[in-house]
C-alpha cells in the first residue's frame, strides 16, 4: 500500500502521527512525506536539509513542493491553499496514486495546518473513489478519533531520534517532549475516546490517535473504531456522516487565533 502523508511544515511528519506512519512502514507499506512548505524563505536551506535527514532516519520517501508554498501568517493564505490543492492533486493523480492519505485536520487551530486540511478535503471530494483520509491534530483536538496506534519506548526513541534532525525547530520548541507527553496521556484517554466511555484501558504506555473519514457516494463517513492493524490497516467505515463537521468553519473564524 502507498501512503501519502501531507506535511504543512517540515517536522509535522514526526509530530502529527509518527508512530502510525512508522507502524505502516514496518508492515511493508510505502510512506511518502509531501512537504508543502519550508517555513520562511531565510530558513529554506536549513529546513530542506533537516527534513531530508529526518525522512532518511524515519525511512520515509520525501517530496518537497517546488517552490515551497509560502504559508506563514503574513502570506497570502488563499494563494497558499490553492497551491496546496494543486500539489496534493498532482500527488493523487501521479503514476502511483496513494491508497491512504494522512494529514492535518481542517480544525487544527494553526492556520497552515487548517488550510492544508481543507486542501486535502477539497481534493478528495473531487475524486470518484478517493482513498481514506486519516487526520491528526497537533494544536487542536480530534473530537471523535477512530483509530489508535499503541507503541513502546523503543518506538518513542526512534521518533525522537528522527525528530532530532529538525535541529533548528527543536531549539525553538522541543516537540520531542510534546510527542512523548502526548503519547503517555493518549494511552490513558484513547480507549474511552475511541470506543466509548467505560471502555477498558489500553495495555500500552504510549498511544496516538487519528480520525478516519471515507468518502462514499458523495458523503463523508466516519471510520470504524479500532486499534491499528498495520498489516491490514483499512476497514469498512461506519454509517455516521461527518461532512457537516468537516465543512464547518474553524473556531479560528469565530474567535480568531494567536496568528491573526
PLM region spans:
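The feature marks non-catalytic terminal segments
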Residues: 54-58, 129-260
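Active-site beta-strand->loop->alpha-helix modules in alpha/beta enzyme cores, enriched
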Residues: 1-132, 222-226, 231-260
